[in-house]
């Protein structure tokens, strides 16, 4: 039996003055310790999901729907308990900075939790080191690069020891190298701390590395499954305006020419190796 850390049960949410729901009767579950990618076009409801998970928003009718995080049903009396379990890294880290230095910013969440100062200093030093920013502990966040700022934002979340990290378009403003560095960092942190990661993105290359993919379209769950189950559905993804990852585009083109590669070919390295093996047999 799977251990689900997050579950949505028939969740509908409508923004004030909006003529239609942003989410409509949405149900899904996320397994503890997994990496889930939530994909969809702009306006599909992805970021609304992240705000509901963290209690920043509430479903239209809690009597007809429920959101559960780490065994706690989200409600007015449990919202702060849930928020301690979930950390969000947003698209623009500048909007999250509150401290004069990197260390001050990382300490902010601990101060709100009244963590004793000696313990706080140890936690901050460890969190800053874990994201490779120890040399910048006394720097002003405004002087950092985009990738460095995201590292500091991740350190601030890591310091308060959440169960879930949500990357809400967190790499969309970074160059390809910076993006991959941040994703590699989060993968390591996830494994070292047994965290659950939710990546909200329209970048399917990023989503290809997830354990599970949820596809949203106009506030509804269009499909879900492993990347190798979702990405071959080229027409569905094109219809909702998403670009297919290169590996899956090439596999589709080869398939149309009678060359079928194994399902487990899901990244560039495996693709190159498979093509070399195929070439050696010709």
UniProtKB/Swiss-Prot annotation:
UniProt-listed CDD domains: ABC_cobalt_CbiO_domain1
Compartments where found: Cell membrane
EC number: 7.-.-.-
Protein's membrane topology: Peripheral membrane protein
Record-level Gene Ontology MF annotations: ATP binding; ATP hydrolysis activity; ATPase-coupled transmembrane transporter activity
Enzyme class: translocase
Binding, ATP: 40-47
Cellular component GO terms, alphabetical: ATP-binding cassette (ABC) transporter complex
Source species, domain of life: Bacteria
Keywords, ordered alphabetically: ATP-binding, Cell membrane, Membrane, Nucleotide-binding, Translocase, Transport
InterPro entries registered for this protein in UniProt: AAA+_ATPase (IPR003593), ABC_transporter-like_ATP-bd (IPR003439), ABC_transporter-like_CS (IPR017871), ABC_transpr_CbiO/EcfA_su (IPR015856), ECF_ABC_transporter_ATP-bd (IPR050095), EcfA_1 (IPR030947), P-loop_NTPase (IPR027417)
Predominant location: membrane
Residues in ABC transporter domain copies: 6-243
Subunit structure: Forms a stable energy-coupling factor (ECF) transporter complex composed of 2 membrane-embedded substrate-binding proteins (S component), 2 ATP-binding proteins (A component) and 2 transmembrane proteins (T component).
Primary role: ATP-binding (A) component of a common energy-coupling factor (ECF) ABC-transporter complex. Unlike classic ABC transporters this ECF transporter provides the energy necessary to transport a number of different substrates.
Similarity comment: family membership: Belongs to the ABC transporter superfamily. Energy-coupling factor EcfA family.
Protein name per the record: Energy-coupling factor transporter ATP-binding protein EcfA1
Species per Swiss-Prot/TrEMBL record: Lactobacillus delbrueckii subsp. bulgaricus (strain ATCC 11842 / DSM 20081 / BCRC 10696 / JCM 1002 / NBRC 13953 / NCIMB 11778 / NCTC 12712 / WDCM 00102 / Lb 14)
Lineage: Bacteria, Bacillati, Bacillota, Bacilli, Lactobacillales
Gene that this sequence comes from: ecfA1
